[in-house]
Amino acid sequence: VLVACSEGEQEVVVPTSECATGLKWDAGDEGSPLMNPGEDCIACHKREGEGPDFTVAGTVFPGLMAADDCYGVEGATVIITGADGVEHRMTTNKAGNFFTEKTIKTPYTARVSYQGKERVMLTPQTSGACASCHGQTASAGAPGRIALPE
């Protein structure tokens, strides 16, 4: 389920006033597990007709506000529990991205675990396109980005 880095990934160092982590993706749609943090992976892959067929995908950020392409947080665990009780665990990569192609029974619940703390999503979901609500501009009642627990 998790990622492997490939050669040719491009990131740039930016001021922390621009991106909290000080890193930003700078390679456009160059195929990589680190690409386009914060953007809607599932919608893009369907629209472009290429890339893995993710069932759940998103990015974990240090806080609720972050611009698209800013790197998120590496090493957080995203736990998706399907309606059947099966847990699917994903660890965020260097860009904060997580994803899976496994079938997940909906509605599912979600939580983020990091350094002994958890943040729980309160409402069960049927879409795995996390950034469709947790985007640069939050929608559908989301408070903002998927953020680390406080």
Short names for language-model regions:
Residues 6-9:
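Bacterial signal peptide processing site
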Residues 110-126:
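A short, solvent-exposed loop/turn motif at the edges and junctions
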Residues 84-95:
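Short, acidic Ser/Thr/Gly-rich low-complexity loop/linker segments typical of extracellular
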